[in-house]
Amino acid sequence: MKKLLAIVLAAILCLGLMAGCGQTTIIVNMGDDAEATPEATPEATPEATEPAAENTAAPVVDDTPLPEGQLKTGLALVSVVSSSSKAATADADGNAQADTTFVAVLVDGDGVIQDCLIDCVQTKIAFNAAGEIVTAANTAFDSKIVLDDAYDMRKASPIGAEWDEQANFLADYVVGKTIDEVKGIALDDGGKPTDADITTGCTMNIAEIVTGIENAVANAKVLGANVGDTLKLNCNAIVSDSSKSASADGNGTAQADVTVGAYTLDASGVITSCYLDCVQAKIAITAAGEVASEVGTAYDSKLVLDDAYDMRKASPIGAEWDEQAWFFAEYVTGKTPADVAGIALDESTHPTDADITTGCTMAVGAFIAVIK
């Protein structure tokens, strides 16, 4: 009996030690599934040095054997409260800003990156000195790749290069490298590269991009992409209608929803793999017009949250958000983007086709918007 008691106590002690080793994954949560129409372009913050999001992620590696001629498809998001966030004054609105970096990769069976796409979107939500949200719900934000020269970093760049040019240079640089080689990229205290092989084409802060590349490779899955397929990456970023003004009863929430889609197309324009995710960046604001969320606060994406997103109990089919997203991604594989654009939806962008609603009943308007 004493021996049995000792064994039980030892087991409890081990469980306690294990519980202290939890990890937090830093990946961005994508939008609330609403379709958006791009409006005003956000103001650029050239070569800004953001506090790097610590890469504490521990993605589940897909050990599925890679069929001959295929590649793994990976996607990762890194979303943080920007240091450009600022309080409101009597003379000017405040800015609740989240920066979401997202990366897509194709990886071969040896873990070597065969293709890489990098992008970032700055979601800037204005609020006044009373903590009232000023930016309208569903206001859309273009990514830096889409903005191109309108992002306006070139004049501040020591090499005269725009953000998208530097991001594309870095993406090309990591092709042919493994995740360990990417982790080995030397950065200074401001997150900027120091290797001359990189600084000839990229001198901006890349700390969060490197984290995104690492996580995208680690997250890569066998989804059907083949050697020779074309990798695509798009986002749909909007002000969520869940945003609310502050009041005497509590802080308000400036919420941006960013939905991201990475997919591959074969030579005929047919989708061969699809990876979807979404992050909800919720920045707290006070009734005094101040930003209550700390700079650098990171947000997990819905895929990372898994059951913690807690949609299952509200789902008519008892399915969590990530389960429905994967079902929809599998459904569109084998179709063209034009086919996807023609999917029947109700007025709230919920699918109506029984072939979809058996596994996905949530709004998919944002998914369709990023597959184009």
Residue ranges and their predicted role:
Residues 22, 46-49, 165:
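Intrinsically disordered, low-complexity regions enriched in polar/acidic and amide residues
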Residues 2-24:
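Sec-dependent N-terminal signal peptides of Gram-positive bacterial secreted proteins and lipoproteins
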